[in-house]
């Protein structure tokens, strides 16, 4: 998904300046810079760069596909429970897997410097980039809001069933597809001499507007929402820490929140350079860069976006591991409190007084009970719920 400076498209293909100059009316299409395929002769430096990028992407593809398939198998095996985290992790792993499956087409285009997959390939592979990118960030936004609700408004999450969460996950894919449809319909295969290029049917202004819109829906909008949620969570945890210290209560473990935030930050770190590169090509076309430099930047941004999907499975494993430990601790604590005298009264009282007027300090008993109601019991052998 890394376009060249001159071509303003996305998935990854490395288009050179000469390719851009061939487009009608000087249209600076950054369409999958590499998807379109460069036309200038290959130098030794270009051959070495192509070989290195092909090897790196192939390695990323193998590692990422194995990791995400493993995640999907494990998550689907234990998806019988209504644990929200597992429903969303399945969606993230599926998006990563679909994105990684485009690597063979990218590598083939890099090596041959031509597009061999026809008009349907243009539409599917170009659209797949935007589809999976939006599905991932939308799912991460929902996960952040779920954790926010579980910490600050746990009673609101009790009524949310597994079916509700699956519907929400389906909605993220439908919204991502809706945002991707314009590219799917506009992209087409064009012959330029002996080369095949994937180009949009619309003009440069429409293309720039569309890419700017997608930057807003994939980076800016979700970033503002997630940032606001974590700022409020940080404030709530700080207030809760003060209250917990005074009342000698133990704070809920925030490791799950940290891991979700880590996945979000990794997404931004990998995709923000790609988007800045694309928008720079759209709004500042006269860049003092040689074709070789543009290709190298295109290669690096491509590796970053695929690297995100390659690293994510390891973070998903840590996330689910910490989530299971978190639930076990909550259930053990709840079980011991329920066995004590008057536990029912104290539980109901804690639910009523979950959010205190002094700044929403967290009630550990209420949160424990809510997590147990929302999630099925964790078996003693450590299986996923």
UniProtKB/Swiss-Prot annotation:
It is a multi-pass membrane protein. Residues 1-53, 113-123, 186-208, 284-298 are extracellular. GO terms for biological process: blood vessel diameter maintenance; regulation of blood pressure. Signal peptide: none annotated. One of its GO terms (molecular function) is urotensin II receptor activity. Keywords: Cell membrane, Disulfide bond, G-protein coupled receptor, Glycoprotein, Membrane, Receptor, Transducer, Transmembrane, Transmembrane helix. The chain crosses the membrane at residues 54-76, 87-112, 124-145, 167-185, 209-231, 258-283, 299-320. It comes from the Eukaryota. The keyword Glycosyltransferase does not apply. Glycans are attached at residues 28, 32. Residues 77-86, 146-166, 232-257, 321-385 are cytoplasmic. InterPro entries: GPCR_Rhodpsn, GPCR_Rhodpsn_7TM, Urot_II_rcpt. Its main location: membrane. It is found in: Cell membrane. Disulfide bonds join 122-198. GO terms for cellular component: plasma membrane. It holds the Pfam family 7tm_1. Belongs to the G-protein coupled receptor 1 family. High affinity receptor for urotensin-2 and urotensin-2B. The activity of this receptor is mediated by a G-protein that activate a phosphatidylinositol-calcium second messenger system. This is Urotensin-2 receptor.
